[in-house]
Amino acid sequence: MAPILFLPILQILLIYCTKSAQAQLNISIGSSLTPQEVNNSWISPSSDFAFGFRAVDGNSSSYLLAVWFNKIADKTVIWYAKTSSNGQDDTIPVQVQSGSVLKLADGALSLRDPSGNEVWNPRVTDVGYARMLNTGNFRLLGTDGATKWESFGDPSDTILPTQVLPLGTALHSRLLATDYSNGRFQLNVQDDGNLVLYLVAVPSAYYHDPYWASNTVGNGSQLVFNETGRIYFTLTNGSQINITSAGVDSMGDFFHRATLDTDGVFRQYIYPKSKQARSLWQEQWRAVDALPENICQTIQTKVGSGACGFNSYCTFDGTKNTTNCLCPQRYKFFDNERTYKGCRPDFEPQSCDLDETAAMVQYEMTPIDRINWPLSDYEQYSPIDETECRRLCVIDCFCSVAVFNKPSNTCYKKKLPLSNGNMDSSLQATVLLKVPRSTNSPSMISSGSSKWKKDKKYWILGSSLFFGSSVLVNFLLIFVLLFGTYCSITSRKKTQLSQLPSNSGLPSKIFTYRELEKATGGFHEVLGTGASGIVYKGQLQDECGTNIAVKKIEKLQQEAQKEFLVEVQTIGQTFHRNLVRLLGFCNEGTEKLLVYEFMSNGSLNTFLFNDTHPHWSLRVQVALGVSRGLLYLHEECNKQIIHCDMKPQNILLDDNFVAKISDFGLAKLLPVNQTQTNTGIRGTRGYVAPEWFKNIGITSKVDVYSFGVILLELVCCRKNVELEVADEEQTILTYWANDCYRCGRIDLLVAGDDEAIFNIKKVERFVAVALWCLQEEPSMRPTMHKVMQMLDGAVQIPTPPDPSSYISSLA
């Protein structure tokens, strides 16, 4: 009886051992795979990856030959076989029906359809065996163990950690998520050493102008996705260009991939792998970095439709790192699934036989909110007012969109097809779309031209008899009033300009005090207060109702006037994603006001110091954003700018929590050949560098010191100085962080913050960077360029010296 009972157990063990062996041993000559059967894939030893037949999404009778993530529910495809299309350079995905066979025989790997015709082979011979590696790489090897062919060497749209793309290779996006044909975008590692993203004119392989390039012609070497999760482009001199900066999540805790998506964005993704990661994160792919950051704004091609199809526009969601293509009102997609084909009007196009009056009756210009097609202009008028701009487009049968720029009184006309459409929140112009009037009936439209031609002369005759006697007087009165108002406003604005430096790089808009008083509702809603004034929320009386923040300088002393001029001069000559944009100013007598773009998520101070910790990923995003902004001020402006008052209150967050540096009232501008300056003490207690209290020159390193304090506050979600803490040693964050770092107890700084604990390696890195920034000796502090490299993980961080004094500025 015992042997009989033991037999089933032995069979189970044999089955288990056989499956385990299949996942670990070499794939030998004679092995084969077929769709729709248990034996349809070869699995890596870790079971993380599989190579074989995968059903095409939405088509259970068609199969790809592919490599995929085997432990993820949706079996994400990372490689798929392609074959040449009619002998041309472009390729198509290999798709076969059930009954097809993939066989490793006679020293070669061959895929044949049910009729026995070969549909794919990797074109290598003398193959001894194959392997599905734990890296996701499928290899064919000779009997001597040398690699004959590998999937890593013939990439599709995705690369994985440990994968390298040498010169002459490329990634091709898919046409759709479910259509594996070559799509509209390519990432090329060119033979000339340049790494380039191209828009492609499908179905051909013709490239339009690149929308991103590394600009390394003659110097580029290879694109690397290393084992730590960093993606960079190496140069022939050994240096590196970071392509993404997200190499921070443990390879043991997350699956990683980088894919050229169907929208043209090269994104790096992670997926929770370990039990601990799955307990903290949703089991789905999460984008942690992207190139370009906002493709809607990046692609501006002279030929081609742009990021989306013709007559459509592109929108970008920064919180989800996604793009979307939409049609403007009264337009619809040619194909709702294949939106890249663009949009068409849902109404009959305007007839060129209509006279002006009939066109005005049948069509109107309706404003659309911050949507623009920047390269579709075919006519321009200036100077002109908005009413005339509308009229000129309505009566022109070619015109579909008009853009009126109020500051310059310029009108631009655009005709179909419209290209490079995007949603632009910074757009200050009024965009007008021509559509049929809603009151039009079909009979009215068809007969409008003849009817108005017939009646027009009678209408003109009657109205001229009735109004003829008074029109001249009315015209003269209106002209006098308008001319007087114009002269008054012009005089005030000239006075404002005369009080400012001639080379100040002023913003384009000069406001009157009355305009800003009206925009803020009488300075009613307070957003915040500072040493030199109060900031109010307002709304411009433009077509878009643009929200603004108005800083009203309250102090009338000479120092306040100086700060006002410094701020106008400083921000007026800067433009960067991580700097708050100055839209305009008012300088009427004692009234000094600055008009900024409105930041909907307030200051970092409010965001960071509350009862709930913001997500770790958002804090990292803010830290990187602030560092980029400071790098721009210190090293990338025409004149070096030292902010001098970096603190959380002066870092604002927009709709997508992008950090923007603000409040340049204490800033110092240095000529190109000058690196330090002498000035009085500036800044805010707790963030001021020690050299402010010494008789030495001030350099950009004072901002680096302040950034070190802010970085620690971002890590720990607490202020630098907190008097009401249980442990006196924790009162001053910079002291406590140094002690924790020296003792190897960084975890104490983020106790109770599960996300930070999970990313403890990056927490340790950020703390080390902060301690370098907080060195008392300015020359010991890194530049912001070096800070960026350390935060990104691009360079090793040596152990920072123990600073002799963090808060000498508090004494």
Swiss-Prot record:
Record-annotated PAN domain positions: 352-436
Domain EGF-like: 292-344
Keywords assigned by UniProt, alphabetized: ATP-binding, Disulfide bond, EGF-like domain, Glycoprotein, Kinase, Lectin, Membrane, Nucleotide-binding, Plant defense, Receptor, Serine/threonine-protein kinase, Signal, Transferase, Transmembrane, Transmembrane helix
GO MF assignments: ATP binding; carbohydrate binding; protein serine kinase activity; protein serine/threonine kinase activity
Residues that carry a glycan: 26, 39, 59, 219, 226, 237, 242, 321
Binding site for ATP: 527-535, 551
Domain Bulb-type lectin: 24-153
Keyword flag Kinase: yes
Protein's name in the database: G-type lectin S-receptor-like serine/threonine-protein kinase LECRK2
Species per Swiss-Prot/TrEMBL record: Oryza sativa subsp. indica
